[in-house]
Design a protein with these regions (language model features):
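Repeat-blade elements of multi-bladed beta-propeller folds
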Residues: 50-53, 88-113, 138-164, 189-209
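Aromatic (tryptophan-biased) beta-strands that constitute blades/sheets of beta-rich domains
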Residues: 24-85, 123-138, 174-183
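N-terminal signal peptide c-region/cleavage motif recognized by signal peptidases
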Residues: 17-19
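Structural recognition of the beta-propeller blade-terminating site
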Residues: 68-71, 118, 169
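Short alpha-helical segments and helix-capping/turn motifs at coil-helix boundaries
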Residues: 33-37, 99, 187-189
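N-terminal export/assembly segments and adjacent metallocofactor-ligating motifs
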Residues: 75, 112-115, 121-122, 200
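Mature extracytoplasmic enzyme cores
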Residues: 113, 164-176
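Bacterial N-terminal signal peptides that target proteins for export
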Residues: 1-11
Length: 209
């Protein structure tokens, strides 16, 4: 997917409607629901998608069964959102879903973008643009990309290409804190999705990635 998207002028995030689900217009998403440590520990039992790998085992399995091998062929788009992309960038984000709100990222130059959208309607709850230092572009090993966020304790955590770890308010997208975890001048960048665990945020960094 990474290489294919380098040739695309735009990438899209699709919301699909299952034919067996209610087809009404649907109400707006509930107010931002803080994700607790207990919710994350039991994520494999949730109908939401609370973290990058689905749960701490990273098995990317959902217990939901409304969409199955019988009716998947009948899915139709409910809404489409263009995140924007370009040559030398790609869409590699894994969306996180919490109580009707979908959180995802994009790495369109020159900055990192974080989005919170109503899962049913495709309408924005908030969008945040995080400025990225230009010296990160030349050292990123595989083009500009971002793999997603961690949501926990009322915060949305995201890493930026220039090796910052940023905490955003889950309800508003406002920056709560911003820390440096690496230096692009020394070849360090960040593209990974952070991991929230027991009140902490875990992130790694390595040369040129």
């Amino acid at each position: 997917m990474r290489y294919w998207n380098r040739w695309c002028s735009a990438v899209t995030l699709l919301g699909f409607a299952a034919p067996l689900a209610a087809q009404g217009s649907g109400g707006a998403a509930m107010p931002a629901t803080p994700v607790t440590s207990d919710m994350l520990l039991n994520a494999q039992q949730s109908g939401d998608w609370l973290m990058y790998g689905g749960n701490y085992w990273n098995n990317r399995h959902s217990p939901l069964n409304t969409i199955n091998t019988t009716n998947v062929k009948n899915l139709v788009p409910r809404w489409v959102f263009q995140t924007g992309s370009e040559q030398n960038a790609s869409l590699e984000t894994t969306p996180v879903v919490v109580n009707g709100i979908i959180y995802f990222t994009s790495a369109v130059a020159p900055n990192n973008l974080v989005f919170a959208y109503d899962l049913k309607t495709g309408k924005p709850v908030w969008q945040k643009e995080l400025k990225v230092a230009s010296n990160a572009f030349g050292v990123a090993c595989c083009g500009r990309n971002n793999r997603g966020v961690a949501v926990a304790n009322g915060m949305v955590y995201v890493a930026t290409l220039d090796a910052h770890l940023v905490a955003l308010d889950q309800a508003t997208g406002d920056v709560k804190w911003d820390v440096v975890v690496g230096d692009p001048a020394q070849g360090y960048t960040e593209t990974m999705a952070p991991l929230a665990l027991d009140g902490n945020v875990i992130i790694g960094t390595s040369g040129a990635e």
